[in-house]
Amino acid sequence: EALALNHLETDRFLHSAYASGLACLTAEERDLGSVIVDMGGGTTSIAIFMEGKLVYVDTIKIGGHRVTTDIARVLSTPIADAERLKAIDGSVMPAEITGIAPDPLREVVRLGRSDNITIPTLGSATEVIGQTIERNLLSAIIRPRIEEILELLQGRMKQAQMEHTAGSRYVLTGGA
């Protein structure tokens, strides 16, 4: 309806993961086989390309906003600040930053290993209270949700008997 109101016509509609695959993968990657994972705020989609063609597409209703709310809840910080933390300081691979292997959340808190990040916390409307956390703590909050999303996608591919179709080339994209 919005298209018609603006005097626009469509030739066809494309799944967002398919469009991401066309934009992000080279022709060779699409030919050899690749899985594109397109993580948005509310959904995460996958598209599998093989021999230059789209062979599978799926979407789950979990996206980057869940990661943001996890950060906000654990750190008692406003959603906007949690989003900034995720985008600027977030990582699922703390070893890449610190040279230390990833630890579960409880181990990060107990051991206190990595560099620090200062974040605002929820307080009264008239004052901003800040706290300092370790970068590995942020990673330990983010990593389980990303693992959950990837495991759900892997389960969907397995259910559709597509888990081995594209080999081991995965490309992550999206705005989340």
Model-derived features with residue positions:
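Nucleotide/phosphate-binding catalytic cleft detector across ATP-hydrolyzing
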Residues: 1-35, 53, 78, 89-96, ...
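Residue-level signature of catalytic and energy-coupling elements of molecular machines
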Residues: 3, 38, 71, 153, ...
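Gly/Thr-rich phosphate-binding beta-strand-loop-beta motif of the actin/hexokinase/Hsp70
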Residues: 25-56, 71
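Active-site proximal loops enriched in glycine and acidic residues that flank catalytic Cys/His/Asp
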Residues: 39, 48-50, 58-59, 121, ...
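Extended hydrophobic-aromatic, low-complexity segments
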Residues: 56-58, 68, 80-81, 150-152, ...
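A conserved active-site cap/scaffold subdomain adjacent to cofactor or substrate pockets
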Residues: 61-85
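Feature representing long, continuous alpha-helical segments
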Residues: 69, 136, 140, 144-151, ...
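Glycine-rich beta-strand-to-loop/alpha-helix junction loops that act as flexible
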Residues: 168-176
